[in-house]
């Protein structure tokens, strides 16, 4: 039976949850980091860590030495391609590695890791299947979809017309050699990039309407899109699976979310989901933790909870809402192969830099936030 009383309880030990835990523990607060899984563990993800997350990873002392550098993006259409450079290198890093590294970082900072299934949350604590964690502040880092979203009656869970599903598998092959590739198919898209250990991650997103008749059979769905799109057939032919089967996601719904729900501070995907094509999801998870930490500290120190909640809600919207909106515009294009090809024929060279400005934070601004 677990019974704890702490300053902060965090539900979910992904990149956002572990980062927030480490930041708060370094400020001297007692923190419980709750996750049902043991580490290391795998998760569905594009496994692309954008350059605007690097100041946070570096400040936490995360060693990314084995993660390949990614300095370029290539958008592959039916008849044309478009390539552009990143202003700073990103890294290809698996969730197996990154989640474990951040979790270890949090524990090293003094965080109490709790491996248990959480069954209920409130602003005052977390009920576990085998106990309870009482806390002055609770943070939700359970990802893009969880039982607690339904418990809290968040509006997006009722949306059945905009549901997407992710799928991912690791492969071995020639690799992408410092490039992330983006491919289009009807009602979806996928990204291809290398991670550590000579592995290439192929991860996609598809609208639920495309999955009718497949019933979770991702092999048959991939065969279908390979038959539809020659670039996909050529790409998949270069690789052999490196793991058994696919990982897939719960519904991915791109609807607005509040960064605070019933007094619970939300971070990472629980606070807002950016389209995976941007490669900014993990960066946003780390950045939302960086933004939330001082407001949670303020709530703990000053006791003016409403001011802290409103401050975080406003700062979160300022930093992330425009990115999420722009990601949906680009996803509309990328999930329509004919429209993408028409756009590629325009040869708009500034499209890549424009896309990066609209879907990322300024790296130097994040570095200044880290420096405090």
Model region roles, listed by residue range:
Residues 2-14:
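Beta1/beta-strand and adjacent pyrophosphate-binding region of the FAD-binding site
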Residues 17-18:
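N-terminal Rossmann-fold NAD(P) dinucleotide-binding loop
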Residues 25-45:
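Glycine-rich FAD pyrophosphate-binding loop
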Residues 38-58:
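Conserved N-terminal glycine-rich FAD pyrophosphate-binding loop of Rossmann-like flavoproteins
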Residues 53-101:
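A conserved beta-strand/loop capping segment in the N-terminal third of enzymes
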Residues 105-235:
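Predominantly flavin-linked oxidoreductase catalytic cores and closely associated redox partners
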Residues 212-292:
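FAD/FMN-dependent oxidoreductases across multiple families
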Residues 294-372:
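C-terminal helical "tail/cap" subdomain of flavin- and related membrane-associated enzymes
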């Amino acid at each position: 039976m677990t019974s704890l009383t702490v300053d902060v309880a965090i539900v979910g030990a992904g990149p956002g949850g572990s980062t927030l835990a480490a930041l708060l523990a370094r400020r001297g607060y007692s923190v419980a980091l709750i996750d049902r899984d043991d580490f290391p563990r795998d998760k569905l993800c594009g496994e692309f860590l954008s350059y605007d997350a690097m100041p946070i990873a570096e400040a936490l002392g995360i060693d990314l030495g084995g993660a390949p550098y990614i300095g370029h993006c290539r958008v592959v259409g039916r008849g044309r391609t478009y390539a552009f450079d990143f202003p700073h290198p990103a890294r290809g890093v698996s969730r197996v590695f990154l989640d474990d590294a951040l979790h270890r970082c949090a524990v090293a900072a003094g965080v109490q890791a709790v491996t248990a299934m959480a069954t209920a949350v409130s602003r005052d604590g977390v009920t576990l299947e085998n106990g309870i964690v009482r806390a002055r502040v609770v943070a939700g880092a359970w990802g893009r979809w969880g039982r607690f979203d339904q418990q809290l009656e968040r509006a997006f869970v009722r949306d059945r017309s905009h549901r997407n599903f992710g799928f991912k598998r690791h492969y071995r092959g020639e690799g992408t050699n410092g490039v992330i590739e983006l491919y289009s198919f009807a009602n979806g898209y996928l990204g291809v990039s290398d991670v550590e250990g000579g592995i290439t991650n192929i991860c996609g997103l598809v609208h639920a309407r495309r999955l009718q008749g497949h019933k979770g059979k991702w092999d048959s769905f991939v065969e279908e899109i390979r038959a539809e799109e020659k670039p996909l057939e050529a790409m998949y032919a270069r690789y052999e699976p490196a793991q058994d089967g696919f990982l897939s996601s719960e519904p991915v719904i791109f609807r607005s979310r509040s960064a605070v729900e019933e007094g619970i501070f939300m971070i990472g995907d629980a606070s807002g989901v950016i389209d995976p094509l941007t490669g900014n999801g993990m960066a946003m998870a780390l950045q939302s933790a960086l933004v939330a930490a001082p407001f949670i500290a303020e709530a703990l120190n000053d006791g003016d909870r409403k001011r802290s909640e409103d401050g975080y809600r406003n700062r979160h919207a300022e930093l992330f809402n425009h990115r999420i909106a722009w990601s949906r515009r680009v996803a509309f294009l990328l999930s329509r192969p004919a429209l993408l090809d028409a756009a590629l024929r325009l040869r708009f060279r500034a499209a890549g830099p424009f896309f990066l400005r609209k879907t990322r934070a300024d790296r130097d601004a994040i570095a200044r936030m880290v420096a405090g």
